[in-house]
């Protein structure tokens, strides 16, 4: 193993230790606002949520959320940016999020990614999508071909433009 890889691994492990791991929203009576108040009382740390998270029409921002273990549904919400979110283990629904301007730090989506009917103009830091990718009715669908999109990120499924 190269020294650079060892250093990256050590730094990644240190970051993991600073990550508050929340098993699921059910521990907060499935109430996003209760979770946010708890996080505020803890100094708004970086955090991850295990399992699925349904926040449709519910949020404008995700705060310091870094990872979601399962499916994340933000479809039709007022979300503007995914902020610090880096990894979604399952699929990610952002369909019809009219205020969405940025994918923030998002790098990995384990399942499909629906960006249909959004104003997203760039895939930002996105490196991988495990399922299909819907870019229909977006500025990206007019700007790039399927082949160009495939050259930008790695993924398994179909691209819908």
What feature does the model see in each segment?
Residues 49-61, 66-79, 84-100, 105-121, ...:
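Concave beta-strand-loop units of leucine-rich repeat
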Residues 1-61, 144-161:
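N-terminal capping/linker segments that flank leucine-rich repeat
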């Amino acid at each position: 193993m190269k020294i650079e890889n060892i250093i990256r691994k050590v730094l990644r492990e240190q970051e993991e230790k600073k990550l508050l791991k929340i098993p699921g929203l059910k521990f907060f009576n499935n109430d996003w606002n209760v979770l946010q108040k708890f996080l505020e009382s803890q100094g708004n740390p970086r955090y991850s949520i295990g399992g699925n998270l349904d926040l449709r029409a519910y949020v404008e921002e995700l705060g310091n959320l870094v990872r979601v273990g399962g499916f994340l549904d933000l479809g039709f919400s007022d979300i503007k940016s995914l902020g610090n979110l880096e990894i979604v283990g399952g699929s990610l629904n952002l369909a019809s999020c009219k205020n969405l301007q940025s994918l923030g730090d998002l790098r990995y989506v384990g399942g499909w990614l629906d960006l249909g009917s959004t104003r997203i103009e760039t895939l930002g830091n996105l490196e991988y999508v495990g399922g299909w990718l819907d870019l229909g009715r977006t500025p990206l669908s007019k700007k790039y071909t399927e082949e160009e999109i495939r050259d930008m990120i790695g993924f398994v499924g179909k691209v819908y433009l």
